[in-house]
Every structure is written in structure tokens, then in C-alpha cells.
């Protein structure tokens, strides 16, 4: 069976040609999949019945199945656990900002990076996600936003699966009735008001460890015939695979690249992040400077603040010496993980660390903590379900 959800328009043309179909069908099908968010070939009403049946027999649409949806009572952040066709589980997060909806997605099932403070890599890497599975997370959440099924969160406890069941019933009902999900017309006021406009590839997995599929995903995500999300509204986070950072720089894309730094020195970073055993901290930072100079896009450094580990005055001074003046660092109070002993510093201590960096000429922000009353840390929701 062909994974039709992972094919860009050019690949769709080739595939349809092998079925004896005209090239113009590719754009029609692509729009159904990634703009109208169809979940079944039978919903593609401007295709002949014969072609719909042929596609049903030859190909499949990646539709992640919601296993659990948690919704924060504090800020409305929604955390999704999806089951993929091979029964793998992945997490995604939907966040509401003043500018609109933003989604954080996973790029792999598990992770091989093994960062000491992260729940995602505790079970190692199972596999990379296909472009369709990465897009599928966004599209499943977009269907949810458009269908407004998550009102049930107001009536149930945070760990309920009722939201997921209601969403599953909605998509199943659409398939049974051969109707597409209730997606507003593109450019309509309702569509523009509720569309996901920003994407962060910062969930489970190392995106640059799934490099080829990541590039296809970016191409499809930004296609005007699909979700049409601007490259400038896409952030990709990496632990620091230096050759891939440089290779990505040569593509001269307009995406934002973020480096998970988390330590001010090679010695400390090696203890927290095994990737530092392969790529020295100065190499990783140098690659980010190369990316910024080559693309003209400002890069970001992520720094999980861990009480007593990397939050001292000396750490702030060493960090400012490592980075260039005017660099931007995003301070993230570490999320508690039950299998780890790491804890976040107090809010006051985090602000003090931020001010010290700014005194040294580093632009520092403290990430807004969202979804703290649900399984907010990356990988936690998946692990909780696997342990059942």
C-alpha cells in the first residue's frame, strides 16, 4: 500500500501516472488531503468513483488516531497522544497565543539522543516519522480545532479520554457518511481565525536525525495547496548534529533553527547530553552562527534551567562568553519527570539568571510555562500510557 499522505505534488503526479491517471489529479488529491483534511478517499467527491476505489485499494491516508487528549484548566493548552497505523504512540501539543494557534509536533517515535532530563528518550528510538505522520499530527489537531470537539474538557477531569473518544467518533462518522470533516473554506473569516499558523518541531525525537523526511515535511507544510504555513512560522529544534545544521544552512530556508544547549561548558553539557560526546559545544554553537550568517535568520538557544546544575552566577557568565553578543536564549524552567531528580529553580531565581545574561549582552527570555497542570513534559503522556 502506498503512503499517499507523504507524497508532495510532484511525487503524486508520478504515482498517479503509474496508475494511468492524468497529472492534474495530483493537485486535486493533494488539496483534499492537506487543505480539506479528508480522512477517506470516498470523501473526494470531484474524483471519479473508479479512481476513488482504485486509490482505496492501492494507497492509504495517514490519520493519527487520538488515544488521549488532555486540556489544561489553567491556559487551555491541549496535549494529544496519537496512535499511528503501526500502533506507535506520539505526542503533540496545541497552544493558544495572542497571534493564534501554535502546534508542537514529534519527529520520531522515541529518541536516541538520551538527554538526562528528558522523558522522550528513556526507551530509545523506535523509528523516524514519515512526512505524512508529521503533517498528520497538525492536520488531526486542525480538524479538532475546526470541529470544536474539545469543549468536553470543561466537564471532565484532565486525564479523561472522553475528548479523544468524541474526536474519534467525529472522524469515524465523517468517513461512514462519505463526507469530509467540517473544514471552513480557505480564506474565509472562520478559517483564518481558527487555522494553525505556527509549528514547532520540538516534541519527541531529534528532527535532524530524520533529516530527509523533515525536508519533505517542510516542503509539504508550506505548499500553498495544503496547510500553507509560512517557513518563517516554523521552528525546528536540534540537539546539535553539526553536519546536518551546516547542510540545512545551505538550503537557505527561512525557518527558525533552535539549538538545545542546556549547559554553558563542554564538561557540563556532556553530562546532560550524550550528543556532546560527538560534537563539542563550541562546534555546535559555531554551526548555529554559520546557519544564521548563511540564511539571515536569527537562531535561538534553548536552555533548561535546572536548580543547582546550570543556574549559578558562574554558569551565566560562562554562557555569555560562549555565545555572541546579541544572541537570543530561551530559558526553560525544567519540567519535572518522575524518573529524574532534576527540579526547576524558583521564578525569582530564573529572573535573576535572565538579568545576569542581559547584563552580559545576551537577549534572554523565560519561556511562558503552559500546560503545567497536565503531562506537560515531552514524552510523559506516552510513557504513562505505555506503563499501563
PLM regions with names:
Residues 143-148, 191-360, 364:
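Conserved AdoMet/S-adenosylmethionine-binding subsite of the radical SAM
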Residues 88-92, 98-106, 113-254, 265-267:
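Conserved Radical SAM active-site core
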Residues 53-56, 105, 279:
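Generic detector of bulky aromatic hydrophobic side chains
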Residues 1-90, 96-98, 146-154, 173, ...:
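Auxiliary Fe-S-binding modules of radical SAM enzymes
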